[in-house]
Regions:
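Conserved donor-binding/catalytic loop of nucleotide-activated donor transferases
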Residues: 114, 252-255, 270-279, 298
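Active-site-proximal region of nucleotide-activated glycan assembly enzymes
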Residues: 112-174
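Short amphipathic alpha-helix
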Residues: 13-25
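Conserved nucleotide-sugar phosphate-binding/catalytic loop shared by glycosyltransferases and other
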Residues: 3-11, 30-85, 156, 307
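Donor-nucleotide binding loops and adjacent catalytic segments primarily
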Residues: 41, 46-50, 172-178, 182-259, ...
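C-terminal alpha-helical cap of glycosyltransferases
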Residues: 340-358
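A short, well-ordered alpha-helix in the C-terminal region of glycosyltransferases
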Residues: 327-341
Length: 358
C-alpha cells in the first residue's frame, strides 16, 4: 500500500506524523510512505533524517484575521493545491493522511480531486482550520482528546515515538543522571518550553534558581536553540542545555516537569507518568489550555497562566511539590492512567483499513 502523510511546520504536526510512519512500517513493512511538507518547517530536516522521502509544496499560511495575507490566500491556495496534485499523480497513494497545519489543506483538496480516501488526525483539543476542512471530506477522523468537536471523530490519542511510549524511567534513571551531571540524591525539575524554547519560562525558573537550590531541588533546564541562560550551578546542580536529543533520558532524570502544553508535550509527559506544571502558550484559540485539561482534571498536573508565571510563583510553588514524594507519585499515576500509549498503531490501522477499502 502507498500512503501519503501530510503535515509539518511545527513539532506538533511533525512528531505524530513520524510516529505514525513508524507504526505503519511495523504493521506492514511493505507499506510505501511518502511525506508532504514545506521547505520552511521542521519536517524539512526531521523527515529526511527519519529515512522518509519528502515532497515539497509551497507554504500556505491560513490567516486568522483580515489583512494583506488573507487577500493573497486564494492564489497561494491554487499554487499549493497544484503542487499537491502533481505529487499525488506521481506517487499514486492509496490513501492521504493529514495531521493539520499549512500542508494538509492542499493535500486534502488534491485527494478529493482524485477521489482518494482521506484520514484526518487532529492533535489539539480545539481543531484548526485545516482539519475542520478535511473532516468535511471524510468519515475517517481521529482525535487526540475526547472533547474535540469534529464530525465522525474517534478518539485514538496522539501518536508519539516508541522511544518514549515504551520507556522504563526507572531502568534509565542511573544513565540519565550521569548523562546530565545530576545528583541521584536530589529531586529533579525538568524545564522545557518545547522545540523552540520559551522566554517566559526561562526567566521565571532561572529567577528562582536560588530558592530552588536552597530547597534542594536540582534543575535540568532545556532553554531552546534561540535562547541563552547564565545560571550558576553549585552544590545543587542547575544544568542548562539548548537542546536535548534524548528526551527519554531527560524524562528518566525528572521527578516533575515545568513545560508548555502543546499536545505532543502533554502526551509524552503524562504518558511516561510525570507530574507537570503546565504553562499554556497564550496564543491561537486557547487549545493549549484545553490540551492539558484532562490531565489537570485527573489530578496529574497543575496549570498556571503564562502571565502568572514569575520567579516568585516558582519559588512559592515548586519546592513544596518537588520535596513531597507521595504527592509526586500520586500525580504521576493519575497522569499516566489517562493517556493511551498505542495511538500510533491505532491510527496506523485506521489508515491501512481506509486504503484497503478504496
Amino acid at each position: 500500500m502507498r500512503v501519503l502523510l501530510a503535515g509539518g511546520g511545527s513539532a506538533g504536526h511533525t512528531s505524530p506524523l513520524l510516529a505514525t510512519a513508524d507504526a505503519l512500517r511495523r504493521l506492514d513493512p511493505a507499506t510505501e510512505i511518502t511525506c508532504l511538507g514545506t521547505r520552511e518547517g521542521l519536517e524539512a530536516r526531521l523527515v529526511p533524517e527519519a529515512g522518509l522521502p519528502l515532497e515539497i509544496v509551497p507554504r500556505l499560511p491560513l490567516p486568522r484575521r483580515p489583512g494583506p495575507d488573507l487577500l493573497r490566500t486564494p492564489s497561494r491556495l491554487r499554487a499549493a493545491r497544484a503542487a499537491a496534485l502533481e505529487v499525488v499523480d506521481r506517487v499514486r497513494p492509496d490513501v492521504v493522511v493529514g495531521f493539520g497545519g499549512y500542508v494538509s489543506v492542499p493535500a486534502y483538496l488534491a485527494a478529493r480531486r482524485r477521489s482518494l480516501p482521506i484520514v484526518v488526525h487532529e492533535g489539539n483539543a480545539i481543531p484548526g482550520i485545516a482539519n475542520k476542512l478535511g473532516a468535511r471530506m471524510t468519515s475517517h477522523v481521529a482525535t487526540s482528546f475526547p472533547d474535540t468537536v469534529l464530525p465522525h471523530a474517534v478518539v485514538t490519542g496522539l501518536p508519539i515515538r516508541r522511544l518514549i511510549s515504551t520507556m522504563d524511567r526507572g531502568a534509565l534513571r542511573t544513565e540519565a543522571m550521569a548523562s546530565f551531571g545530576l545528583r541521584d540524591d536530589l529531586p529533579t525539575l525538568l524545564v522545557t518550553g518545547g522545540s523552540q524554547g520559551a522566554a517566559r519560562i526561562n526567566a521565571a525558573v532561572s529567577g528562582a534558581a536560588g530558592d530552588l537550590a536552597a530547597a534542594g531541588v536540582q534543575v535540568l533546564h532545556v532553554v531552546g536553540p534561540k535562547h541563552g541562560l547564565d545560571v550558576a550551578s553549585g552544590e545543587v546542580p542547575y544544568v542548562v542545555l539548548n537542546y536535548v536529543d534524548r528526551m527519554d533520558l531527560a524524562y528518566a532524570a525528572a521527578d516533575a516537569v515545568l513545560c508548555r502544553s502543546g499536545s505532543n508535550t502533554v502526551t509524552e509527559v503524562a504518558g511516561v507518568g510525570l507530574p507537570a506544571i503546565y504553562v499554556p502558550l497564550p496564543i491561537g484559540n486557547g487549545e493549549q489550555s484545553l490540551n492539558a485539561r484532562p490531565v489537570i482534571d485527573a489530578g496529574g498536573g497543575l496549570l498556571v497562566a503564562d502571565a502568572a508565571l514569575t520567579p516568585e510563583w516558582v519559588a512559592a510553588t515548586v519546592p513544596g511539590l518537588l520535596t513531597d514524594p507521595d504527592r509526586l507519585a500520586g500525580m504521576g499515576a493519575a497522569a499516566r492512567g489517562i493517556i493511551p500509549l498505542d495511538a500510533d498503531e491505532i491510527l496506523a490501522r485506521m489508515i491501512l483499513d481506509a486504503g484497503a477499502a478504496r
